[in-house]
Amino acid sequence: MIFDVHVHLVGMNPESGCYVSPTLSTGLIYYLFTWELGLAGVDQENVDEAYRDQLVTWAADSDLDGVGIFAFDGVYDDLGHYDHERTSYYVPNEFCFDVCEYSEKLFPVASVNPMRRDAFDELERVSEAGTVALKLLPNSQGVDPGDRRYEPFWRRVAELELPLITHTSFEHTVPALDQSFGKPEKLRPVLDQGVTVIAAHCAGSGVAHPFEEDFGTWLAMLEDHPNLWGDISAMASVSRFPYIHKVLQSELARERVVLGSDFPVPVAPMVFSPQLGWSKARELSQIENPLQQNLEVFRALGVDDGILHRGGELLRLPDGVGD
């Protein structure tokens, strides 16, 4: 099955338990977000439902067989208490599970910050509820994956056979508390506990950080860690487009990556005009469904079926799905 493992859920209505900081929910960022999704003019209290309905429609109308939908845990202090002041973005696991009930193509990816006091209890709860993986964005959630205090947590994640989809390298959208937490080498203690780790963006630092590269570290780590993978999310966007070429040029990388989009990050087909030609890039730009557009851009660039299908093989899908 063709599986996009990397799609973000957006919720802004406090009644759903979601939270987006004023930095992200006002001004230019919010305008561009709503305009890109066709949600301009939708009241913020109605954005949750409108975004959900768009996701359901786009997934149904795409060639994708499955889409991993992310919850997003908040920031926690050293005592394990939720830190609202430092949290920029929060999507509760329960909200994520509820949204995924609207389509058989949507699969919940829960988020559990290992710093929270009830981390083990929440991990067990979401595992029992059917999460197919866990999501972490260390830079913005204030989590150092290399901190050995969390090894028992990661050990339990491995026992539950839940893969971890974690952001790597620099974060560009959600305000970062510590960019060093995204370094791929920080994942070694997690990998050593036996967790299957999917490094989002293959640790590509992005065009904004051309002299601070982490992709090579991730690529080298593949040799030592058979449970380390990567996803190609955002590699069809302006921010990380050079990295799809790096992945496709490496036989090892091609064998260890899965499909992702990083939706709602916009796809930018025109940046691939030198490879695809202006006419083909323009044709891809006309695709209105962003999930399908991301898929078609990667197909045009030579992403093979192994990459497109591999994500579903790594996730802990319900029995009978994908058979």
Predicted segment positions?
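An N-terminally biased module of ancient metal coordination in phosphate/nucleic-acid-related enzymes
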Residues: 1-71, 76-87, 305-323
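Hydrophobic faces of well-ordered beta-strands that scaffold small-molecule active sites
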Residues: 3-7, 67-69, 107-110, 132-136, ...
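Active-site beta-loop-alpha junctions enriched in small/polar residues
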Residues: 8-10, 72-74, 111-115, 137-141, ...
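Short, flexible/disordered intra-domain loops and linkers
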Residues: 19-22, 37-45, 76-88, 173-181, ...
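Active-site mouth loops of central-metabolism enzymes
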Residues: 36-49, 106-116, 144, 209
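Well-ordered, non-membrane alpha-helical segments in soluble/globular domains
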Residues: 41-55, 86-98, 180-185, 212-218, ...
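Active-site gating/metal-coordination segments in enzymes
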Residues: 73-180, 244
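H/E-rich (His + Asp/Glu) clusters that bind or coordinate divalent metals
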Residues: 204-323
